[in-house]
Design a protein with these regions (language model features):
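Glycan-processing catalytic domains of CAZymes
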Residues: 1-269, 275-358
């Protein structure tokens, strides 16, 4: 799914982002004609349904061979916060696009729950923007299964908004793993992985300090989601996820951050994918914590201290022998100029793995 604008503003960057969106369509056509993109096309508040459907950009998207089409020929179509426009508005868009030769199947992306029944009359699929903090249940699939043909489930790593000094705490990798687990257990039809590459919400962009760790984790859970079978772990991998400072760190400038109603979670996590049992260790300054882990996936968390500057160290041992070890690429600071609560992440692999024919 890629964002576009039906009527991009001439000065606020929407045209610039649109160039990249169309470049993705062109790349998909050139590199893999079987790879299709679901266009999510924004509208301004005052744009009429007819002007939206007749937009030069909408027509370009509709004519592109990389745009996702259903077996019945309809073009899959979406927009973030679909409910910001009325059902009647969307009916007129659908009628106009059909008259223009491009019937669409609307996949609603919702930020709320109260209009789902109304939109069930016109939506081929439904997905929610989702939760950004882990919980016990997110009944999206159960709620929307009777209302639509396809149910999409949201997948996100974290939500850190520098522009408002506001963050929802994902508790290291917990939100990402929890959302994937629920999508699998609830048998969602689609998974919507929100990368947010406009750098405004820091969800999963690989050029940030989280690196490619979320993509490694997503690759594992995508296979599980698509096949219905948990993938076998055939090599040891350690992933560390932590913030660069405590939420209550001494800051020299700026205002404090708002962590929402759940509050901050100050922990260092070592997430292990193990082929067999082992001992996990986390070293913080002069103190070492350890946990016995079984084969499979183990999350090991320890408190992130508030007034200590250090570089976290991580290791996996078996029978007293170090299998994998390494330091975080990101030091933890005891004071900062401006705080940055976005999580950092990295991967550690056994040093001798390549000699074993990996």
């Amino acid at each position: 799914l890629v964002d576009f604008w039906a009527d991009p503003h001439p000065t606020n960057g929407q045209r610039y982002f649109g160039l990249y969106s169309f470049a993705l369509l062109d790349a998909a056509r050139r590199i893999d004609p079987e790879f299709k993109i679901l266009p999510a096309v924004y509208t301004s508040k005052d744009l009429t349904p007819e002007a939206y459907a007749d937009s030069e950009y909408v027509k370009r998207i509709a004519a592109h061979p990389a745009a996702l089409r259903l077996p019945d020929g309809r073009l899959a179509w979406s927009m973030w916060r679909t409910e910001s426009q009325s059902v009647d508005w969307w009916r007129k868009v659908m009628a106009r696009m059909k008259a223009n030769g491009t019937p669409i199947a609307l996949v609603g992306q919702f930020n709320s729950w109260d209009k789902l029944k109304d939109f069930s009359e016109i939506c081929y699929g439904m997905v929610h923007w989702g939760r950004r903090t882990p919980g016990t249940d997110f009944p999206w699939v159960k709620t929307t299964r009777p209302l639509t043909e396809k149910v999409g489930f949201p997948i996100c790593m974290q939500d850190v908004r520098t522009r408002g000094r506001w963050a929802q705490d994902s508790r290291n990798s917990e939100t990402l793993r929890w959302l994937w687990t629920q999508a699998i257990e609830d048998d969602a039809d689609w998974a919507f992985i929100y990368t947010v590459t406009d750098y405004s919400e820091q969800a999963m962009a690989p050029s940030t300090r989280i690196g490619f760790v979320p993509y490694d984790l997503n690759a594992y859970y995508i296979q599980w989601f698509k096949t219905g079978k948990q993938p076998e772990i055939v090599r040891d991998r350690l992933y560390y996820i932590h913030r660069p400072h405590h939420s209550g760190v001494e800051q020299l400038k700026g205002k404090p951050w708002n962590y929402g109603r759940t509050g901050p979670s100050d922990q260092i996590e070592l997430l292990a994918f193990l082929t067999e049992p082992g001992t996990l260790k986390i070293k913080i300054a002069d103190e070492t914590f350890q946990k016995e882990a079984t084969a499979g996936i183990t999350s090991f968390k320890v408190p992130l201290p508030k007034e200590v500057a250090f570089v976290p160290e991580f290791s996996l041992e078996r029978e007293g022998r170090v299998i994998a070890s390494g330091k975080s690429q990101y030091p933890v600071m005891d004071k900062v100029e401006y705080p940055n609560p976005m999580y950092c992440a990295g991967m550690i692999a056994p040093e001798r793995e390549g000699h074993a024919g990996d």
